[in-house]
Amino acid sequence: MKKVFSVMVALMMALSMIAAERGKLIHVDCSTSKNLKPQLAFCQETKDGQDVTTLLVKTVNVNQYNEFNDASRVLVRFADGAAVRLNKVPGSAVEKKKHTEKKGNATISFYDTYTSYEVSPEVIEKLETGIAIIKVRIVFKENDSKDYDIVEGYQAKMAEDLLKSYQEAVLKNRKVNGDTADDDF
């Protein structure tokens, strides 16, 4: 039993390190409690000679892990009225991590999930042209979704931080592939 627990702890630590290595997570600033706000970051890797960009989404729940299936998706509404659908990366695992915080005499457990979604070039183009994200909907599975209205004063900052996350992901991917680009000099 102790060995199984040790393996599980090691697996959880590895998953959280993987998520941390993927990029800095950007808070979705909305009216939700600070601990329950989703966080986003871009990741990029090369598959079959193609650079593939994904959006890593971290969600938090206090009762249990959020559950995802193949119908999971993220809908992003931009300030120009456009809405973009990001589908869950087929076959990608949902990474999970539990942590606790003490609040007075109570200990609260938080259940984090990390899920990857496909990113269309349109999302990057809108961020590059300074178009802010005003709303995010995470569809965990059919009939189970949550909307996040982005606080107006934070919209531009969030778009800027996400663009920076994308640029950092591109540079990391270049370095992993041995590209000694001068972009980060």
What positions do the PLM features span?
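Short small/polar-residue motifs
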Residues: 34-44, 71, 79-83, 99-103, ...
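Bacterial Sec-dependent N-terminal signal peptides
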Residues: 1-23
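Beta-strand elements of well-folded, non-transmembrane domains
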Residues: 59-63, 78-82, 142
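An ectodomain-focused feature that recognizes extracytoplasmic/extracellular
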Residues: 20-74
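Generic marker of residues within folded, mature protein domains
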Residues: 9, 47, 64-66, 76, ...
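Generic cytosolic/nucleocytoplasmic N-terminal low-complexity/intrinsically disordered segments
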Residues: 1-2, 36, 57, 171
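Internal interaction segment
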Residues: 82, 86, 91-185
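Beta-strand signatures of extracellular beta-sandwich domains
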Residues: 75-77, 137
